[in-house]
A protein has these predicted regions:
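NAD(P)+-binding Rossmann beta1-loop-alpha1 motif at the extreme N-terminus of oxidoreductases
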Residues: 1-47
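N-terminal glycine-rich dinucleotide-binding loop that anchors FAD/FMN and/or NAD(P) in oxidoreductases
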Residues: 47-66
């Protein structure tokens, strides 16, 4: 993958995803994807109803676009999933948002695409829960290139 050909997608435009989108969108073509149509419409008007970012901060992302249409993910080759990972009353993570995001992006994956999960789940969740969904739906084979949570010091 060549840096000139990078097109980033940030899936989930909450308190983690939206600032990430803005920073990438200052330099690279970046698609902000969220299923909440009202959120997308307000962001297109440079209004963040959560008040995390100002209109000026949103406007600084000159290469950012917004969409709630999954087919727009087809043009992206770096996909960063930033959906919430709530916990149940026993403090166990609810993985449904990650699973649903994986099902949403999988049909649009191509060989050599990069998928990053920015999440607060237990170590191995991406590999154990999300990768099988991506592989089954996309027909591709996932490989874990880098796991910043693993201790590689000897």
């Amino acid at each position: 993958m060549n840096i000139e050909n990078i097109r980033i997608a940030v899936i989930g435009l909450g308190y983690v995803g939206l600032p990430l989108l803005v920073e990438f969108g200052k330099h690279y073509p970046t698609l902000g994807f969220d299923l909440n149509q009202e959120r997308i419409h307000s962001l297109k008007q440079q209004q963040d109803n959560t008040l995390e970012l100002s209109s000026e901060e949103l406007a600084s992302a000159v290469k950012a676009e917004y969409s709630y249409t999954a087919t727009d993910l087809n043009d992206c080759n770096v996909l960063i999933v930033t959906v919430p990972t709530p916990v149940d009353h026993h403090k166990r993570p609810l993985l449904e948002p990650l699973q649903e995001a994986s099902r949403t992006i999988a049909p649009y994956l191509k060989a050599d695409d990069i998928v990053i999960y920015e999440s607060t789940v237990y170590p191995g969740a991406s590999e154990e829960v999300c990768a099988p969904i991506l592989e089954e739906i996309s027909g591709l084979s996932a490989s874990q290139k880098n796991d910043p949570g693993k201790n590689q010091c000897g």
